[in-house]
């Protein structure tokens, strides 16, 4: 953990964010000059891949060593300066400073407090929620609800089983890394319960309940406790269990397919095609806002009944696929968090 803390500080200083897996490239005398979190094997339009990045960094070290030395010196100076700074002794001032710095990172368009990849970051949301309630700060409360709405109605949530995927690969919370972890479910259940208690909006009660139902049905371990996670991969590749094509939706729903596609943003071209290895025609369920509101706006008489029917038919269709493997380790810390 101590080593990780050092290099995480380097990554945050160089990129403005951190996360895992963590990659930091060092000079022979252990001075950092490049940092990143997840690096895919192959490059995409938005992200360099490891097979291209390694030769590039090798060429920079070989041909532009002065530039490398300058970058590493700047980073080391910034880290050392940060270490030398005095500590705030006033707890109230420390809390206000933390709130100011976090809200300065807020994504006004899509919610969240970091660039992509976007994690749920529930401890940040819980801190800001308590701050907003104590100080009656409506603007911060709006930041939290916008973030939670985007998470809930984006591709990061499994709209059929109710669980949340590990993180979103893009700023709009559209394409997730499809792994589901018990610790994330526990934290998401907590934040959606607490925001429901504060706002009294029933959508948050429903969302908290759906996460808990996923935990108690899919992750529940027979002897007691909860399994650790569901894998991102299934026999068809990463995320294949969760992806849909336009033709599949037409086959399942017939004349109702247009309504379903509109509600979930499904297109013939695919709403995630080309993103991080997704194929043409690949779609995630991506309503962007509460599906009940979408159905009401479309003139559906009984939105709740219609939505339940749509989810049921999609769930039955997905049961024909092979589910991703379950990691059935029962971890004490994650179970304590869940319970």
What are these regions (language model features)?
Residues 1-337:
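Replace the tail clause
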């Amino acid at each position: 953990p101590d080593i990780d803390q050092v290099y995480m500080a380097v990554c945050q200083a160089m990129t403005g964010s951190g996360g895992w897996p963590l990659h930091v490239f060092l000079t022979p005398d252990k001075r950092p000059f490049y940092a990143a979190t997840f690096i895919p094997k192959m490059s995409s339009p938005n992200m360099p891949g490891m097979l291209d990045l390694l030769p590039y960094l090798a060429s920079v070290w070989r041909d532009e060593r002065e530039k490398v030395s300058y970058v590493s010196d700047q980073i080391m100076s910034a880290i050392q300066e940060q270490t030398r700074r005095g500590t705030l002794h006033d707890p109230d001032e420390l809390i206000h400073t933390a709130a100011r710095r976090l809200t300065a990172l807020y994504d006004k368009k899509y919610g969240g407090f970091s660039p992509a990849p976007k994690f749920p970051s529930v401890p940040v949301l819980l801190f800001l929620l308590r701050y907003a309630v104590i100080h009656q700060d409506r603007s911060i409360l709006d930041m939290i609800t916008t973030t939670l709405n985007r998470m809930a109605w984006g591709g990061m949530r499994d709209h059929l089983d109710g669980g949340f995927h590990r993180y979103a690969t893009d700023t709009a919370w559209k394409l997730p890394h499809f792994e589901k972890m018990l610790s994330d479910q526990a934290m998401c259940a907590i934040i959606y319960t607490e925001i429901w208690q504060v706002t009294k909006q029933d959508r948050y009660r429903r969302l908290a309940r759906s996460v808990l139902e996923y935990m108690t049905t899919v992750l529940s371990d027979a002897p007691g406790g909860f399994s650790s996670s569901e894998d991102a991969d299934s026999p068809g590749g990463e995320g294949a269990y969760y992806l849909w094509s336009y033709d599949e939706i037409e086959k399942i729903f017939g004349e109702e397919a247009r309504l379903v596609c509109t509600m979930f943003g499904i297109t013939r071209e695919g709403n995630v095609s080309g993103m991080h290895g997704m194929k043409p025609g690949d779609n995630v369920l991506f309503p962007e806002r509460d599906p009940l509101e979408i159905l009401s706006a479309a003139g559906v008489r009984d939105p709740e009944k219609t939505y339940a029917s749509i989810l049921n038919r999609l769930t039955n269709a997905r049961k024909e696929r092979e589910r991703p493997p379950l990691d059935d380790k029962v971890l004490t810390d994650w179970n304590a968090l869940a319970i």
